[in-house]
Amino acid sequence: MKFVYLVVTLLVSLSADPQKSSLTTVFGDLDGDNIEEKVLMSENKDGQRMLQIFKQNNSSEWKLWHSFDSIVINSDDGGAMGDPFTELSVSNRVISVSHDGGGGRFTWRYLHKYRYDKKDKTWRVIGATIAYLDKSKKVETLDYNLSTGKAIYTANCIGDDENQDECIDIKNFTFYVKPANPPLMKNFKIGKNKIVIPKFNIEMYY
């Protein structure tokens, strides 16, 4: 899956809370009613980031619908590469949030997808695409659809690590790990969720 970096930085004050500033705002229909919602990534004076979703009322005023405080990684948690946030987008009722970070020998990239469950009236994590790069050994990718349970893992050996002989090239290894229910967005912790690649016993975190 390709990562497209189209970040729009607004840096304007939120009228609802003078302690927060808006960093990125996107629009799209998230609940299937053909009316666009507003999705806003904000940051308070302490650097804590929040993802907020707004709906318009009958007076065309934006009212807060849902809010999440663990979906966007803070600016100082990206390692030597700096601010890890790269993109916020909405398409086909899905919110996508991209990050990358690391530094030196190791770098990482995350793309997570979230969708509103109209039946349960809650938000769930439905997809994760992860890439890890060890410049001296290998690059790994995992594309995981939490709705269907389908996961595709790839590993490409690179570099000159002394343990390079232990590295195995793996191309599009497909397996299924379907949770009983996709994780709730409100409880989700980016990079803290383990999945084990069967046959190879490799651990990945999304």
Residue ranges and their predicted role:
Residues 30-43, 90-99:
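Acidic/hydrophobic-patterned starts of short beta strands in beta-sheet-rich repeat architectures
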